[in-house]
Amino acid sequence: MQSNLYKRQKEPLLIVISGPSGVGKDSVVKRMRELGLPFHFVVTATSRPQRPHETEGVDYIFVSKDEFGRMIEADELLEHADVYGQQKGIPKEQVREALNSSLDVVMRLDVQGARTIRDLSDDALLIFLVTQNEDELVRRLKERRTESPEALKLRLDMARQEMQGVEELFDYCVVNADSQLDAAVDTIVDIINAEHQRTKPRKVEL
């Protein structure tokens, strides 16, 4: 009798890249895209203004606050949150279509959003990014030059809070050190590959 292992189909993964502001979530996901990895990278909808280096439909889907409210009312978002006064959300149909096509889905979310996804699916794969130390995080946030001193303090206070309870919510913790972006990406890809070898695969249903 043939083993069921030979007949087993690959289950697509729902992968959340999360962590505090300044740990490099955007940089990690951008690098994964550049490498041409065979994943579907979710484009998040946001009501915040577009930054000079960002591309519509690639970095984010930029919408007005009124349009974002309409999307919430129409139940078009898998999760949504108010983050530092700016609304962000994951388009539901985009994720479902990719999973139904057997594609691994990668999304970047803040910790609040990651918690929402965990509530929706115990089998989602949650990866927490960190810097090597807090000094590195402070320097990165300051180098953005997009934060007032008050906003910077708020983000740092929030980061410290988000570091608490990581073990209960996340499956893995990956260090994204300065000048080591590719190493962080390699670690994440190794995690994904290992997850596909599990004898009891994750099965995401949304």
Feature map (PLM): residue ranges:
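NTP-dependent small-molecule kinase module
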Residues: 2-8, 139, 143-147, 164-206
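Conserved lysine of the Walker
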Residues: 25
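Post-Walker A helix-loop "phosphate-sensing" segment adjacent to the P-loop in P-loop NTPases
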Residues: 33-42
